[in-house]
A protein has these predicted regions:
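The feature encodes the CheY-like receiver
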Residues: 56
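Phosphate-coordination loops involved in phosphoryl transfer and adenosine-cofactor binding
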Residues: 1
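Acidic, metal-coordinating helix/loop segments flanking the phosphotransfer/catalytic sites
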Residues: 5, 30-48
Length: 62
């Protein structure tokens, strides 16, 4: 099964993406912050990461 990690701070967007991706048979994991996303990516090794480039805790990493 394909694993997808969504890193997005807006719950409504995460919910929309999760619903669409799970309907296609994908396993979905979520993170609200960049820090949590990095931890989830290292732990779960997703096949695809959908990343919000405007996360508040990611401003200093650009």
């Amino acid at each position: 099964m394909t694993n997808v990690l969504i890193v997005e701070d807006e719950q409504a967007i995460r919910r929309f993406l999760r619903t669409a991706l799970e309907a296609d048979g994908l396993r979905v994991y979520e993170a609200e912050t960049l820090q949590r996303g990095l931890l989830e990516a290292a732990t779960r090794k997703p096949d695809l990461i959908i990343l919000d480039l405007g996360l508040p805790d990611g401003e200093d990493r650009k």
